[in-house]
């Protein structure tokens, strides 16, 4: 057991999907995994291990924001030996060419958080995805016919930002979307020498306000990113 995860050693696979919403973790376990067993209910942050196409895979919620995903991802890596971590979550488009329900693969994650600067105040330490996972995910998504964008995202510490226009301006510099977790996940992956990737479904748009989705749709659909994430985890 770790501080926030009740699993015993061996109950978590070495590859895992990390949705922010614990109910999305439950949905993935019930709809994609065979013989799924719940290994964690602490703080209702549900985690499950099962099989996908004969491969042992886990899925666990992380909550919202970089502090929350940092707690769970670190414990999964350090205490349970997880080697491949793929975030599957939602993001808001910052780019006119990126639309609701399309996928974004975060090649890198800029951030307005001090989570990295606290350790490296003298550097702009880049938060980048595992190229191996990124390359596999891109080709899998293309083979499945999914509209997929690859590029930089913004991992923000703030959901209700007072710098709305500044965030939108980033879209003109090629930033695809804004979310709240990828930079922290990539930083931990660099620190502990594991592979990480963030796959997001666009749930709304900061540049096209008429594009949005319902809370129920965000919880129970958006299955494209789940399929890509699972296929990427088991790809040789």
From Swiss-Prot:
One of its GO terms (molecular function) is purine-nucleoside phosphorylase activity. The record marks 218 as: Important for catalytic activity. Transmembrane segments: none annotated. A purine D-ribonucleoside binds at residues 4, 179-181, 203-204. One of its GO terms (biological process) is purine nucleoside catabolic process. GO terms for cellular component: cytosol. Homohexamer; trimer of homodimers. Belongs to the PNP/UDP phosphorylase family. Catalyzes the reversible phosphorolytic breakdown of the N-glycosidic bond in the beta-(deoxy)ribonucleoside molecules, with the formation of the corresponding free purine bases and pentose-1-phosphate. This is Purine nucleoside phosphorylase DeoD-type. The lineage of its organism: Bacteria, Bacillati, Bacillota, Bacilli, Lactobacillales.
